[in-house]
Amino acid sequence: MGEEWPAPEPVVFTEFAQEHQEWRENRRERLVRPFSGTVLWVGLWELAQGATPFGSDPDLAIVLPEEDSPPLAGIIHRSGQDIRLEPSAGSPLMIREGEPITETTELGSDRSGNTTNLALGSLGMRVHGEPGTDRLWLRVWDEDSEKRESFKLPESYPVSTDWRVTARFEPYEEPRALSFQDVTGGMIQYQTPGELVFRADGREHRLVAVLQSPRSRSYFMIMWDSTATVDTYQAGRYLSVPLADSGDWTTIDFNRAYNPPCVFSAFTVCALPPPENRLQLAVTAGEKRPDEPAY
């Protein structure tokens, strides 16, 4: 290893710890927020080409609770990547913002930049997509879930500046497409511009960095470390890292390693760490796993 390795910018520990606590509180709020709150997710169905009826009739392809849905709420039509919703006569389906759906309507997925959120009783719904795959799902959440009030974040390791480390960004000559297995058995493809190299436990370690979109202002890290055999989620954790500066340096704060969505809901499409991101290191920082992960 070379000798030149800058230290992270110094921080005042009390301020650092307070910022971390605020980050934890904001994370808890996001997890129970309608539209995006993983804890509220109660259904996920992959949408096949053609017609998919949904409602409370147990013989339908997508079955919803009868307290929220009539026997047939509507039919989802998929043609390629285009999705249309045909409501049944008198269906209580609404656009989430309040307009009733009375005729066949195009639905934008949550990767289209024009997401259509639906409401049916206490349920919210939208079409969900993942990067690098043409698979689409109907995602359903319960806005009246008692978990909005009762949910608590899992414990985390004590916050420590020791796990705030400088990393060198090593870009590839050209960005690469890297496929990640997901918990459903499928594959998700992300763009990776390069790798982050950091030092811990007297050695250098590498993590493949991912950009979730061309507009990303941070790297998305999907990682595993040896604490997964003891305290943290067995399948790995996620982490957001600021983009490298003009000198190709950034700071990784492992205190903010967090559980993937599949820890809190079985109705997810979580990407799993690739072999390149399995660290031979115990990262004793960040979120631990709950007593009973959902997946």
Locations of regions flagged by a protein language model:
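Short, isolated positions in well-ordered beta-strands
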Residues: 100-102, 125-127, 203-207
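Surface-exposed beta-loop interaction hotspot
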Residues: 119-188
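Forkhead-associated
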Residues: 41, 46-116
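Intrinsically disordered, low-complexity Ser/Thr/Gly-rich stretches
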Residues: 209-211, 218-227, 233-244, 253-257, ...
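N-terminal pre-domain segments of enzymes
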Residues: 2-43
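Mid-length scaffold segments of soluble, non-membrane domains
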Residues: 69, 75-80, 189-232
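Extended, aromatic/histidine-rich regions of cofactor-dependent oxidoreductases associated
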Residues: 228, 249-251, 255-295
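A short, sequence-level motif marking secondary-structure junctions
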Residues: 67-69, 107, 130-133, 209-216, ...
